[in-house]
Amino acid sequence: MDLIFPLVGSLLLVICVMVGVAFLTLL
């Protein structure tokens, strides 16, 4: 149960970075 939260946090961080990079490249 303790391993789920860091995994979700890192996954959300990767998604946010990918969305940010895609947004900047589209601009």
UniProtKB/Swiss-Prot annotation:
The keyword Zinc does not apply. It is found in: Mitochondrion inner membrane. The chain crosses the membrane at residues 3-23. It is an enzyme of class 7 (translocase). Its EC number is 7.1.1.2. GO terms for molecular function: NADH dehydrogenase (ubiquinone) activity. This is NADH-ubiquinone oxidoreductase chain 1. It comes from Simulium vittatum (Striped black fly).
